[in-house]
Every structure is written in structure tokens, then in C-alpha cells.
């Protein structure tokens, strides 16, 4: 039994080391439903690229020796989800720049489908299941409207394995009266999920880069045990 026990100990040590090398698996979900016009999509895509290359974001990514794994996908209808950046371990500045360049080179796959947020969340959590071993898992759901196709976020959380996943939100076009009344409360009540989940607000797509920069810094900054904030 001693050789078997030694093997189990070794495997546990190797597994623990793999997780320790990655502190966070982060997936960004971009809304390309029909309510997002071509100019807005360009601002969204460009905002992600600019945010990933911002100095304060890079500083947060490389704040410790433990890395962040990053993936990006776009979503709209029930079956319209496309990976823009597959899992990439951001283990240095060159990896972060390459990830940003990959997103910059993408083109929108769909423009005429509704907002199937529950289906998008289901796709995102399956993508997280394929991530490298990481200590934490976060999905960032960006959008400019409420779910209007298929099942909603809460049904997704009940149907898919979200127990160990934090879902943050990035609300776009929420600076107007309609957004204040409907979209922001919807995200806070229905979309945010898990310990420490939070909401970032972009006042239109022109404000997307600023909001994404702020959100990324908060998401990838290493967590201090005992000081994980609650959602807002």
C-alpha cells in the first residue's frame, strides 16, 4: 500500500501545483444581439482590446506569479455563440498583447438574433469547464438589454454547474432613464451570481473601454483572503 499512497500524494501535489500556477480563469462574454449596431460593436470590440492593453490592467494581471487564464466569446441567439479567444494563459506581457491582437482581428459572426442570455451563460460555463486548472472561475456577462429569447439567467444557474463560478455584469447603455428603471435592476437581481459578484456600468458604448478597464482591474487583482467584497 505504501507505493500506492506515495503515488496518490504525488498526484495531489502535482494537481495542487497546477492550480497554484493559475489564480483565475476569466471568460468575457460580449453581446452581439440585434440591438447592438455595427458602430456599437466596433466600440465594444475595440474597448476590450484597449482595456487589455491598458497599463493598470497589465499591472493587475501580473501582480503575482500566479497567472490568469483568459477566454472571450460573443453571444446573441440560442445557438449563436462564437469563441473569439480560446483559453490562453496570460503568463507575460507578450501573451496579454497577443490575446488583445487576437480579439482585434475578429469579426462579428451574427447581427440579427435576439438576446438569449440564459443560453449564453450555459455556453460560458461549459467553456469554463474546459479552462486550465485555476483556483477561481469568473464569467463576465456584458449586455445592453434584458433576456428576450429562451430561458433566463436564473434558469441557467439552476440547470448548469455554476456552484463554483462567479458571474459579474457589465451593463451598456444604462445611463438613460429606461436603463435605470429596468436594465440595471435586472442585472443586479437576475445576472449577478456567486460570492463577490459585482456590476460595472458603461454609459453607452463610447464608455465601454473605461468600464471594461475598471472591471478587469477589479477582477484580476489578486484576492486577499478574508477581504472578498460582496456584490453590488
Specify the residue positions occupied by each region the protein language model found.
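N-terminal signal peptide c-region/cleavage motif recognized by signal peptidases
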Residues: 13-17
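Second-shell loop/turn segments in exported
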Residues: 29-39, 70, 86, 103-114, ...
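Von Willebrand factor A/integrin I-like adhesion domains
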Residues: 172-226
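Sec-exported extracytoplasmic/periplasmic mature domains
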Residues: 49-57, 77, 125-133, 147, ...
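Extracytoplasmic/secreted envelope proteins and their assembly/folding machinery
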Residues: 41-49, 53, 67-69, 100, ...
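VWA/integrin I-like adhesion module and closely mimicked acidic/polar interface patches used
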Residues: 146-189
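Von Willebrand factor
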Residues: 22-86, 90, 95-142, 168-182, ...
